[in-house]
Design a protein with these regions (language model features):
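Bacterial Sec-dependent N-terminal signal peptides
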Residues: 12-37, 361
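Cell-envelope and extracellular/periplasmic
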Residues: 23-24, 33-57, 61, 83-87, ...
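Substrate-binding cleft of extracellular glycoside hydrolase catalytic domains
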Residues: 78-136, 140-142, 155-162
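Loop/turn elements at helix/coil->beta-strand transitions in domains of secreted/extracellular proteins
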Residues: 36-39, 72-78, 131-137, 179-184, ...
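Phosphate/oxyanion-binding active-site loops and adjacent basic polyanion-contact surfaces
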Residues: 51-56, 112-120, 162-171
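Sec-dependent bacterial lipoprotein signal peptides
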Residues: 1-16
Length: 382
């Protein structure tokens, strides 16, 4: 039921259609790039042996459902990069005309390496060519495994899939090399709403939209929230509200979402550096900090940031008040069903605290205890 474990096989012919509509198709003109105010790049890389390819296709169908309901994309465009296998990927433009969506396959890639800064930058350059716009945003649909490095020698976490992982530092560098800072980056993946990720991406985007914990296989309810994401001024509060409402009524009612204003990550880093000088975390109190990975990692790697600050500050009420006020600016919008789930742990967990971001500073997990010290966040705060 999670973004980690789905195996559904769909024919790639779906990419050339509009979700199974058998009505006669009117002759169409070749796609010609036209500049708009906004463009959203949907990046769906190969997800490996535990493929969620079928789920990603359903996500695209849900996006089209939202577009049809709103009778178009407004001042926005959508361009999709989706990998059907380890070797084959497609660049697809989603358009709207006469009450229907249309998918134009603009390019097919064979063995394209999108895991390097150069590969990412080159792909984003193609995005600019095919969808010229004043503002760009990204939606990323794949697996996410927290900030844990794809190799123990790497300093940051990865996303994508086990076969072709993408390191967040390479992703960040690729965006910067392309010269197209995103309005928002939405990770439709597990474990991506962490302070380590947010700090790494502070120059790549204005906002981070992600989940602190595991994401159900259904993913983001795009048929509900896409209209807010395509708006000239995205309604982040509505995104969180409709996400929470959807999952509260879903068959697997587990979910978290948060919007992080990356402009405040530097201020939070400076605050944490100061507090780490004057305060020491008592490991005997680690069980008092809210766990957000529910035994996916044992011992826990992902703790709630607000909960950690409460325990770290202890009886220092003024410092804790300052911390919570800053956290409210850093995470202006968030939502949760009140319960999270772990495929590995095979059980739900009630949330007693939820700030919208995780932190791994107190983790004693053998895989994290040294690698966390190599992240840009740790170096900025210790």
């Amino acid at each position: 039921m999670l973004k980690h474990f789905f195996l559904l096989l769909f024919s790639i012919i779906v990419l050339a259609s509009c979700g199974g509509n058998d009505d006669p198709v009117d002759p169409v003109e070749p796609f010609v790039p036209t500049k708009t105010k906004n463009a959203v790049f949907v990046f769906m890389p190969y997800t490996g042996y535990n493929s969620i390819y079928g789920c990603l296709l359903k996500n695209l169908d849900d996006m089209e459902q939202a577009i049809v309901k709103e009778k178009g994309l407004g001042n926005s465009q959508i361009l999709v990069f989706i990998s059907e296998s380890m070797k084959t990927s497609h660049l697809v433009k989603i358009g709207y005309n006469k009450g229907k969506c249309r998918r134009d396959t603009l390019n097919t890639y064979t063995n394209y390496d999108y895991t390097t800064p150069d590969g990412i930058a080159s792909l984003l350059t193609s995005v600019k060519q095919w969808t010229p716009a004043d503002n760009y945003s990204m939606i990323i649909g794949c697996h996410g495994e927290g900030w844990m490095p794809k190799k123990q020698t790497k300093q940051t976490r990865y996303f994508g899939g086990t076969a072709i992982p993408i390191d967040i530092s390479d992703f960040n560098e690729g965006i910067k090399n392309a010269g197209m800072k995103m309005n928002y980056i939405l990770f439709d993946d597990c474990y991506m709403s962490g302070i380590e990720v947010a700090y790494q991406l502070r120059e790549a985007a204005n906002y981070l939209i992600a989940s602190t914990s595991e994401m159900m296989g259904y993913g983001m309810p795009y048929h509900k929230i896409l209209k807010y994401l395509l708006a000239d001024n995205p309604d982040y509060e509505a995104v969180c509200s409709d996400f929470t409402s959807f999952y509260n009524n879903f068959s697997m009612p587990y979910g978290t979402i948060a919007v992080t204003d990356l402009a405040y990550t530097e201020e939070m880093a400076s605050f944490m550096k100061a507090i780490n000088i004057t305060h020491t975390f008592d490991l005997d109190k680690i069980d008092d900090v809210q766990d957000l990975d529910v035994e996916h990692f044992t011992p826990t790697v992902y703790f709630d940031l607000g909960s950690y600050l409460r325990v770290l500050c202890g009886d220092d009420a003024p410092t804790y008040t300052e911390a919570t006020n800053l956290l409210k600016k850093l995470v202006p919008y968030k939502g949760t069903t009140g319960m999270i789930y772990s495929w590995t742990g095979r059980k739900p967990l009630e949330l007693k605290e939820y700030s919208g971001l995780t932190i791994s500073d107190p983790s004693i997990n053998a895989k994290a205890v040294e690698t966390k010290k190599q992240t840009t966040w740790w170096n900025a705060t210790h």
